[in-house]
Amino acid sequence: IRDSDYIMALVTTTEMFKKAYEGGYAIGAFNVNNMEIVQGITEACAENKAPVILQVSAGARKYANHTYLVKLVEAAMIEHPEIPMALHLDHGDTFELCKDCVDGGFSSVMIDGSHHDYEDNVALTKKVVEYAHAHGAVVEGELGRLAGIEDDVNVSAEDASYTNPAQVQDFVERTAVDSLAIAIG
């Protein structure tokens, strides 16, 4: 996507968040896993002249593979070049997956190291940030885990933990993440 001259380039979530903050509006982030969902979301965004974050979850990766989903987003960008779009990996759990998505054209990845202890989460997140930033992508980290099931990730009540506010500044400074998902209930 980045090298194509016939479609608008993906934007990063950092660019979107800055404009939204300055403009006082929210940005929709939607998990996508097939052509019809991508079409419906981008057509609605075009009608409303709204930027959009298209996310690829673990379930979508199992169903369609992120490589196929990149091509669907490329098609949406050809159809609607006027819409700022970010392609975001949602809850990536390994460096290798994040690297594959960055290499495949994603403008943003989330590394969810919340299943690790704090120091391992910091190390993993920092490694992803270093790679992604070197390749023009941005990174969302995660601190804390909510109980429940999202896609195939089942977090028991015993393993759940809210984000410790005392760790936030240290985590952001040590990892250089661009955004942070927190668990507050």
What are these regions (language model features)?
Residues T13-K19, N34-A60, T67-E82, G92-G185:
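Alpha/beta enzyme core
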Residues I27-N31, A86-H88, M110:
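Short catalytic-loop micro-motif centered on adjacent basic/acidic residues
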